[in-house]
Amino acid sequence: MDRKTRLSEPPTLALRLKPYKTAIQQLRSVIRALKENTTVTFLPTPSLILQTVRSHCVSKITFNSSCLYITDKSFQPKTINNSTPLLGNFMYLTSSKDLTKFYVQDISDLSAKISMCAPDFNMEFSSACVHGQDIVRESENSAVHVDLDFGVVADLLKWIGPHTRVKRNVKKAPCPTGTVQILVHAGPPAIKFILTNGSELEFTANNRVSFHGVKNMRINVQLKNFYQTLLNCAVTKLPCTLRIVTEHDTLLYVASRNGLFAVENFLTEEPFQRGDPFDKNYVGNSGKSRGGGGGGGSLSSLANAGGLHDDGPGLDNDLMNEPMGLGGLGGGGGGGGKKHDRGGGGGSGTRKMSSGGGGGDHDHGLSSKEKYEQHKITSYLTSKGGSGGGGGGGGGGLDRNSGNYFNDAKEESDSEDSVTFEFVPNTKKQKCG
């Protein structure tokens, strides 16, 4: 009887439990908050990477070879979701103090076989792999490189913490709500953090802050992301590295590391909000002439807009389409929008029959037909009490003895029809052509 050939074990990546438990206990508060947007990647380096993607921020925690070992370098990289059915937060399960064994086997390109053991408990399952998941990498090219002592990180957390709470009735600020602006000055080296409400905190070069690369720069990032970044880095209780990378897009890189793991955060820049110089509604002065009061009765000529010399039907439509300001018809009152030049109120009429405040007796030059047409146009616009005349600027040129000239139909009229004429408004006739 031939002995069966023992099958070789597939490539396996396992945890070194003692250093891993030391590391995971430091990160327990961070890992507890991980949600569905987190992936877990097992690499043949060996290393284990947790990557969380949020809006304008990517956080990465890398466990190095001090916490892991591998049986075969042919182990293919595996990426799974941290949120698994039935189990929930996968990495939080590995933070249990009762864990006695944990390993991952490479048996398929489509899944990862995972085994977890505890006293009187053994669990083995397969988790589908996530394909096309890129791991963000650190770039060595940075315009600014600043090292912050752990005490500085703690000061920043105390300063930012109260501002991360949601407040009501927040007034519009010069930069977007919930952002922090980071200013770096080259001479002398200094870094300043400015919040939306104007509060700021500045650090200069000393034994707590070291500047390795300095350039005048400014970057704006979300406040909640920056606060969470500092919390992630504070778990090491070691100095924190802050760098501004401008290789492609402007990024804020914040990281802290110890002998077991590294915490890295990549924050993308928020756009600066600038005041729009065209956001105010500009109102021109051209519309202010309608209904405006004034003395002197200075009237604009209608000759440019068709004039009153046309006896055709188009004149009625032209004037009915736009109400006339009647302040200047009786003399010195304030002018309207479209005003005619036959009344020289205030001595400034365009038809100079006489120079002076009264406007002269230029009405004798008008024919009966012109006066009739003028009366037909304007009589329905003013009451018979003569309310159109204003007492301004020298008595008014067309307000002769007692009332508005156009309302006094008997004066110098050669037609009996004009004496008894009464205008009756008709909606059909007032429609625009």
Swiss-Prot record:
Domain comment in the entry: The C-terminal region is required for viral DNA synthesis.
GO CC term (a single one): virion component
Signal peptide (residue range): none
Modification note: Phosphorylated by UL97 on serine residues, phosphorylation seems important for UL44 nuclear entry but does not directly affect its role in replication.
Protein name: DNA polymerase processivity factor
Subcellular location: Virion; Host nucleus
GO molecular function: DNA binding; DNA polymerase processivity factor activity
SUPFAM superfamilies (UniProt xref): DNA clamp
Segments of this protein annotated with the region Disordered: 274-433
Cross-link Glycyl lysine isopeptide (Lys-Gly) (interchain with G-Cter in host SUMO1): where in chain: K410
A Pfam family assignment: Herpes_PAP
Function: Accessory subunit of the DNA polymerase that plays an essential role in viral DNA replication and acts by increasing the processivity of polymerization. Forms dimers that binds to double-stranded DNA and UL54 specifically to stimulates long chain DNA synthesis efficiently. Plays an important role in maintaining the structure of viral replication compartments by interacting with host nucleolin/NUC. In addition, suppresses innate immune responses through effects on host IRF3 and NF-kappa-B.
Key words, A-Z: DNA replication, DNA-binding, Host nucleus, Host-virus interaction, Inhibition of host innate immune response by virus, Inhibition of host IRF3 by virus, Inhibition of host NF-kappa-B by virus, Inhibition of host RLR pathway by virus, Isopeptide bond, Phosphoprotein, Ubl conjugation, Viral DNA replication, Viral immunoevasion, Virion
Biased composition (Basic and acidic residues): 360-376
The organism of origin for this protein: Human cytomegalovirus (strain AD169)
Record-level GO BP terms: bidirectional double-stranded viral DNA replication; DNA replication; symbiont-mediated suppression of host cytoplasmic pattern recognition receptor signaling pathway via inhibition of IRF3 activity; symbiont-mediated suppression of host NF-kappaB cascade
Sequence ranges of Gly residues compositional bias: 289-298, 325-336, 344-359, 385-398
In-chain residues carrying the UniProt-annotated modification Phosphoserine: S413, S415, S418
Top-rank taxon, per record: Viruses
UniProt similarity note: Belongs to the herpesviridae polymerase accessory protein family.
Quaternary state and interactors: Forms homodimers. Interacts with host SMARCB1. Interacts with host NCL/nucleolin; this interaction is important for the organization of proteins within viral replication compartments. Interacts with UL112/UL113; this interaction is necessary for efficient viral DNA replication. Interacts with UL84. Interacts with the uracil DNA glycosylase UL114. Interacts with the DNA polymerase catalytic subunit UL54. Interacts with host IRF3. Interacts with host RELA.
Effect of I135A: Complete loss of interaction with UL54
